[in-house]
From Swiss-Prot:
Highest classification ranks of the organism: Bacteria, Pseudomonadati, Pseudomonadota, Gammaproteobacteria, Alteromonadales
GO BP annotations, alphabetical order: translation
Cellular-component GO terms for this entry: cytosolic large ribosomal subunit
Family under the similarity heading: Belongs to the universal ribosomal protein uL3 family.
PTM sites of type N5-methylglutamine: Q153
Organism of this sequence: Idiomarina loihiensis (strain ATCC BAA-735 / DSM 15497 / L2-TR)
Keyword rRNA-binding: yes
Post-translational modification: Methylated by PrmB.
Gene: rplC
Function, in words: One of the primary rRNA binding proteins, it binds directly near the 3'-end of the 23S rRNA, where it nucleates assembly of the 50S subunit.
The protein's name in its UniProt record: Large ribosomal subunit protein uL3
Origin superkingdom: Bacteria
Assembly behavior: Part of the 50S ribosomal subunit. Forms a cluster with proteins L14 and L19.
Length: 212
């Protein structure tokens, strides 16, 4: 897994290319990601880079976390995130060092992970794109009903993962291979073509695309 950055979704706008084409972009504000811990096989059983970003009032930081940030010599951030490291990755980073948008200077495609907008309780037609049943022809009650959810006494249960009505959205979603239109190092911004998961103001993780 490649090293990425944690940012905040600012909103959407558009930029114009040299040929005059209008490109819709999502603006991601990426404040410096501070390394709080470098995990290793010997001590943690796996290799990873733990980072934080932003700031948090001292009164809102728990004592264990306050001690963790103090040990790293960094200011308390709004959360902790990890990036798994492959062989040879992350050797240039030490506790207290910073990651900025400059690491995307030569990247063209990115994967963006965020928490999708919650849509509340939704039926199967809206949530899973089920087809509706007949509007007439004798159907008076089951227009949007899901239909059968199982078999008979054997197996005698509804299988796990069955698509049914329930909470829609508010789950971790990754959108892959989005074009990175611009890296604004001066204002710590990433401009990514198209929409990314999550509401305005939510945290997102941006990484080089695995399928690029």
């Amino acid at each position: 897994m490649a090293i990425g950055l944690v940012g905040r979704k600012v909103g959407m706008t558009r930029v114009f290319q040299e040929d005059g084409a209008s490109v819709p972009v999502t603006v991601i504000e990426v404040l410096a990601n501070r390394v709080t811990q470098v995990k290793s096989d010997d001590t943690d059983g796996y290799r990873a880079l733990q980072v934080t970003t932003g700031e948090k009032k001292a009164s809102r930081v728990t004592k264990p976390l306050a001690g963790h940030f103090a040990k790293a010599g960094t200011e308390a951030g709004r959360g902790l995130w990890e990036f798994r490291l492959q062989n040879g990755e992350g050797e240039d980073y030490a506790v207290g060092s910073e990651l900025t948008v400059d690491i995307f200077a030569e990247v063209n495609k990115v994967d963006v992970t965020g928490t999708s907008k919650g849509k509340g309780f939704a039926g199967t037609v809206k949530r899973w794109n089920f087809s509706m049943q007949d509007a007439t022809h004798g159907n008076s009650l089951s227009h949007r009903a899901p239909g059968s959810i199982g078999q008979n006494q054997s197996p005698g249960k509804v299988f796990k993962g069955k698509k049914m009505a329930g909470q829609m959205g508010n789950e971790q979603v990754t959108t892959q291979s989005l074009e990175l239109v611009r890296v604004d190092a001066e204002r710590s911004l990433l401009l990514i073509k198209g929409a990314v998961p999550g509401a305005t103001g939510s945290d997102v993780i941006v990484k080089p695309a695995v399928k690029a």
